[in-house]
Amino acid sequence: MKKRFLGVFIALLAVLGVCAQPVLKKVQVHLVPDHADAIYRLGEEAKFKVIALDCGLKLNDIQVNYEVSEDLMPARTKKSMTLRGNEGTIVAGTMKQPGFLRVKAVVEHEGSKYTSYSTVGFEPDKLTPMVKMPEDFDTYWADTKKLLDKVELAPKMDLIADRCTDKVDVYHISFGNIKGTRMYGVLTLPKKEGKYPAILKVPGAGVHAMSGNVAWAAKGAIVLEIGIHGIPVILENQLYSDLSRGVLSNYVLHGIENRDSYFFRRVYLGCVQAIDFLLSLPKNNGKVGVIGGSQGGMLSLATSYLDKRITATGVYFPAFCDQEAYLYGRTGGWPHFFKNKDNGKKEYVETARYYDGANFARKLTAPVYYAYGYNDLTCGPTTSAATYNVISAPKQVVIGGNEGHWLFPEHINGMWEWMIQELSK
């Protein structure tokens, strides 16, 4: 296993997939852990150096309101301090169990409030998921995949001429799925004759249009970005907004009362169909991988488990991982359904286990490139680390100490470059 920790503290302005890197603010409060790698032993005290800047210059004698909490859990401490000059120290305390401790600092200057976060790990390599593995997990999914035996792929490809370039053709595509539904996506295909690896890009949460990945297709990969809602993905944005507020509102919980009716059953099988589609393309070299973040991270884990033809798996800050952990007093995965203990009905919990990303991670065989950040307030590092730790396939991880629910360009580009290289062997 290769592990690289990049403690970068200056944000670059960039947009990465569906996750936007935050814009640099006028006032910054840097919270710097006293361990260079932000890793501590259980029982060891974590301290943070506080540095306040205004337009990059010292911001002296300002009051800092701060709180300390375990990852995505209620604050254990709320205090205030006044910096001496533009610096100070926060003693955050320790943890008795593996996990992550976070400091949130807020300053008010010239009528505006500015918030910063910094997170450290306490023996995070010892974290493991708390979600239970159903005894018939493998049997259930093997039987469920048999539903595809009766489904005709029946692919359709329509050229989107105004999106094509001198190097890449762009198509709006669709293919068959269970119950008479279809999956839709945007395919980017290198124009030059030859054989290319194929990559399935699975989406983050939401209902939205897709444009296709021309950049990586131009570098020598067939890329298919798919939607999961069974509707075309090149329509007007207003339509997707209306659907997200209407029939697809809170879709991640549709049918959760039963494993056979849950929303993602059709989606997972559609991802397997997408692999069939990619391998059917004449320009494919016979190799296919899958990549995705957040909801897409969960879909990447699930698809790699369900289809062993996949030989490379890219996952960043996966959602739907270790969701059950909330029921045992630890932070669980997005969408945080079980954070409300009233939602912990037996049938809901049992269904979620069959779809939990951590359970798929336990059974992966294809090589995995994994990435997440300690400051992720959507898919917390606790669930990302626990899920990574149970992967037994060949794996490597990139951790961004100050990354949230986004990745630096160097990290996401590194994942794509690794995948193309892996699929070109």
Feature locations, PLM:
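N-terminal cap/lid segment of alpha/beta-hydrolase-fold proteins
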Residues: 34-38, 148-193
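Short beta-strand element of the alpha/beta-hydrolase
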Residues: 185-189, 195-206
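Alpha/beta-hydrolase fold nucleophile elbow
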Residues: 282-293
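Short beta-strand/loop motif that positions the catalytic acidic residue
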Residues: 364, 370-372
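C-terminal catalytic histidine-bearing segment of alpha/beta-hydrolase fold enzymes
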Residues: 378, 385-425
